[in-house]
Structures are given as C-alpha cells and as structure tokens.
Amino acid sequence: MDREKLASLANNVEKFGFGSLWFPEATSFESFSLAAYLLANSNKLIVGTGIANIYARDAVTSAQGHDGLNALFKNRFILGLGVSHVSFVEDIRGHKFGKPVSSMNEYLEKLENAGIDPNLRMEDRNIILAALGPRMLELAAAKNKGAIPYSVTPDYTAKARAVLGPEAWLCVEQKVCLTKVESEARNVARKQMGRYLRWPNYLNNWMRMGFKEADLEGHGSSKFLDAIVCWGSEKRIMSYLEEHLSSGANHVVVQALQPDGMEGTDFPVLQALASK
C-alpha cells in the first residue's frame, strides 16, 4: 500500500468502530515507521505490530520505539514481537537464526534492561509475543502482556488460554472471506495459505492442532483451508469469531481477504462485522 491507501485504511477501520489495527513486518515498511504513520492518521485507534521481527533491530531500539510511540501517542501502541522465519532472518537479513524460545528470552532480557525509561516496568509495557507452541506461550505469559498466535482455530485458542493462564492477553488472528461460493472461498484460501505451508513453525503447530500430513500437502486440504480461513455469510463468520472469544481470546484480529483473490483488505466484510 502507498501512503494514501494506508491513511485511508486507518481512517476506515476507525470509522467502522474497530478499536485496533494490526500489521505485519516482512520486507516492506519498517514496523516503527509504519506504526507512527498509522497513529498519526488516527485519533483513538490502537496500532499493533503483528509482528515486529526481533532480528530487524536490537532490543534497545525496540524499547525506544515502544516507549517513544506510547509517550507521543497516549499509550496507543502495542509491540508484538516474533522470531520470524529462517528464510527472512538468514537469506534476507543475513543473520543466524537462533533457537526461537531462547533467542526471544534473551532479547526480552535485553529489552527489560535497556534503561530507556527507569519508571516504566517491563510488565507495564504493551508487549506481546508471536507464540504458537507451549514454551513460547509460557514465555509470553511470564515476561509480557500475552500472545498473538497466527492462523489458528478456536480449539487452539482454548488450549492456548489454558497455557497462558487467566490474566494474560490472548489476541488471535483469524482470516475471513465473505462469500457463500465454496469454490471461490477455497481458491482464495489456497492462494493465501500456500506461502505458509512451507514454513516449519506453522506446520509443526498445525500438526499439534490435529491436522495430518496429508492436510498440509500442496495448498492444503479442504478441511484445513476451511478451518483456517472462515468463509460464508456474515452470520457464519461472526459466529466463528465469537467461538474464539468464548474459547478464551480477549481479542480477535480479523484479516479480511477479498473474495476475488486480489491483494488488499476487503472493506465490505469489515463494515458488515463492525455493525454486528
């Protein structure tokens, strides 16, 4: 998206009545730069990174970014941190990909000791972790506000809540596609999920969730695609989102996929869900 489309996205999300806007970090905009722009183009919207790569900047810089944005924009920024993927870390950034949990724990310790604002305790910072497996979930509950798992089901949400305990934030991501045409929805899901089915951390988590190897071959089985990308009527989509909430999520991050398979956010489904 260019700057005009990003500003329009923030304005529309806020106008529809949503409380937050989340974005990823890959090879486009740098996380803190984009967060500042989105915050500047909204009034009350909470902006979160989903997620900022810990290999993209050192822990002191992350502490500065988190503390600075929250000071400038009245505590409207959430820093979601993640270890990303081997290919992004080693092939694109040229770093060595470490063991996920130990690397994240070390990063958080450095962030805690950064000394940017001596009056701000680590537990008071708006930091959550991209966590899928139980050990990263445990770290998220122990060191931060909570977790933001990606591409999961309501059953997973219930299990994650059990690991996190009752107090930690649990913000789960859910892809949706507003179409009642099965073939259309499945085509969108295949296009969306194909990129993720080659990354070990997601594959391992989906296997833990009960999917079989056959479900995760190629672009994914119909069973897998329907579980990860919810499609159908507004009522059906809303019901699936509510399943996450009743399973223990505090917040559901909706990724609205366009039914025609084009890139970008599907505003009609966001507007429809906002009215529910």
Where is each model-derived feature located?
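Active-site-adjacent structural elements that line small-molecule/cofactor binding pockets in enzymes
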Residues: M1-K276
